[in-house]
């Protein structure tokens, strides 16, 4: 059981994202969904539950948090971690090894489990969680979704009584989300106490027992799952939540300015670690197009993005712009990539400075206007790395607008974003397309995909297997679920 009694917390470095007068009980064996707009306090609640507050994140804490009878303030983090397993939004933050096998059993190894028992447990997990393709791999060569699977497997291996998830689906494809849902359901059936903070809520509707909606650090409503599912769709939108059912996702991407084949990708191939990641991949893109690059985790999407931007060293094939071949160096000048792990491309000490980086005569008024479009103007003097994950994503998209590049590649730009932030990124993306830029968006986010994309390219085993228009919703959903 998890119990929060009159809990308030503010972070030492910032007044944002804390909680006020939190009273909540998650009963043993119960599965509870925490939802609400970005910055409402969901992640703070998960950190209170697993003891990272106050043992790692410092600030002003009052009230009492108990997990399985342990006061988190008085209990050492090592003891809490035996009882509470956490899967974070960014799995890289919880890795301790460079290979997948060692990472999966790392927690068990630290409990002193004999080597033979470790091997046996690893084999059990491989079958139960469908990990055979991830065994013996270099963690740093995995896709974002594959890393998330390894993080979950490592936590699941230690069999804690309480499982805490912070945006666990943010980097997963639809098929993997379905597998995650099955795992959560299995954990629930086995009696685990589960707390999940999520923006993508559709896959949890048949699993959770209760839905706790947060706003401005407080619990605005706490209802049974059936009551939440009965709410009108208009209420869900007013609450700033994503769809509960994918069938109501909006569709209607922007129209292409001209079918000019400005970008031509011809027979791109890449091998990594002895594996063929891209295999003779070819396609064309026109000015003003917004093309989604979709496919299961590990299909080669991020590798394709790096090739197009001149960031992938090895590989073969040709990339043409207006009929002229582009070297890696020219691609780096022509293209801009918003990375999936966006913290790696933010370099300055303020949001405003980040927007002006590398620009000879930055237009401060233009920077302010663009920041205002995505609700970041109030943070212009903040350090970029002090922003939330969603805010950093939006900042990187803003920088891509200001820098004036013609080929823009976004790798999961809506990962971890709430409805409002997703819509803001969509508006900015549409405006970039209207300027005649070519946009390629690697995404698993079907809501975002259906709203703005003109085409969807499906990659499987390093090859394009389908090229569909954005309006073919039912076919797109079937492909994303692995049903075709």
Identify the residue ranges that each predicted region occupies.
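Helix-to-loop junction immediately C-terminal to a conserved catalytic motif
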Residues: 50, 309
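Conserved ABC transporter NBD signature motif
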Residues: 58-70, 317-331
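Conserved ABC ATPase "signature" region
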Residues: 116-134, 364-379
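ABC ATPase C-loop
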Residues: 156, 400-401
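H-loop/switch region of ABC-family ATPase nucleotide-binding domains
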Residues: 198-199, 443-444
């Amino acid at each position: 059981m998890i119990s929060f009694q009159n809990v308030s917390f503010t972070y030492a470095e910032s007044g944002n994202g804390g909680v006020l007068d939190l009273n909540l009980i998650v009963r043993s064996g119960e599965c509870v969904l925490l939802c609400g707009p970005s910055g409402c306090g969901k992640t703070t609640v998960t950190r209170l539950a697993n003891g990272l507050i106050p043992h790692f994140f410092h600030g002003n804490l009052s009230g009492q948090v108990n997990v399985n009878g342990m006061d988190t303030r008085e209990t050492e983090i090592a003891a809490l971690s035996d009882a509470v397993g956490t899967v974070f939004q960014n799995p890289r933050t919880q890795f301790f090894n460079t290979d997948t096998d060692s990472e999966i059993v790392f927690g068990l190894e630290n409990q002193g489990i004999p080597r033979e028992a470790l091997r046996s447990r690893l084999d059990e997990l491989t079958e139960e969680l469908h990990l055979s393709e991830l065994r013996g791999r270099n963690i740093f060569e995995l896709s974002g979704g594959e890393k998330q699977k390894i993080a979950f497997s490592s936590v699941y291996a230690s069999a804690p009584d309480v499982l805490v998830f912070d945006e666990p689906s943010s980097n997963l494809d639809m098929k993997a989300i379905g597998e995650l849902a099955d795992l959560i359901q299995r954990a629930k059936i086995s009696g685990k106490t589960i707390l999940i903070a999520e923006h993508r809520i559709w896959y949890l509707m048949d699993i959770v027992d209760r839905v706790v909606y947060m706003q401005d650090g407080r619990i605005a409503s706490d209802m049974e799952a059936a009551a939440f599912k009965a709410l009108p769709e208009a209420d869900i939108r007013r609450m700033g939540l994503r769809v509960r059912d994918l069938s109501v996702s909006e569709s209607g991407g922007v129209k292409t300015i001209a079918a000019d084949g400005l970008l031509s990708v011809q027979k791109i191939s890449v091998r990594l670690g002895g594996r063929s990641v891209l295999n003779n991949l070819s396609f064309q893109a026109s000015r003003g197009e917004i093309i989604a690059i979709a496919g299961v985790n590990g299909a080669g999407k991020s590798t394709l993005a790096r090739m197009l931007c001149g960031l992938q060293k090895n590989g073969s094939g040709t990339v043409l712009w207006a009929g002229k071949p582009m070297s890696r160096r020219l691609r780096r000048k022509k293209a801009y990539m918003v990375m999936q792990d966006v913290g790696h491309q933010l370099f300055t000490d303020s949001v405003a400075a980040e927007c002006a980086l590398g620009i000879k005569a930055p237009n401060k008024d233009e920077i302010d206007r663009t920041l205002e479009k995505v609700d970041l103007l109030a943070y212009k003097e903040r350090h970029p790395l002090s922003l939330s994950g969603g805010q950093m994503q939006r900042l990187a998209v803003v920088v891509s607008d200001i820098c004036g590049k013609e080929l823009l590649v976004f790798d999961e730009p809506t990962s971890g974003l709430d409805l409002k932030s997703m819509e803001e990124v969509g508006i900015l993306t549409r405006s970039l397309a209207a300027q005649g830029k070519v946009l390629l968006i690697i995404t698993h986010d079907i809501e975002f995909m259906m709203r703005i994309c003109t085409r969807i390219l499906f990659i499987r085993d390093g090859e394009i297997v389908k090229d569909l228009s954005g309006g073919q919703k039912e076919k797109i959903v079937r492909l994303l679920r692995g049903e075709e």
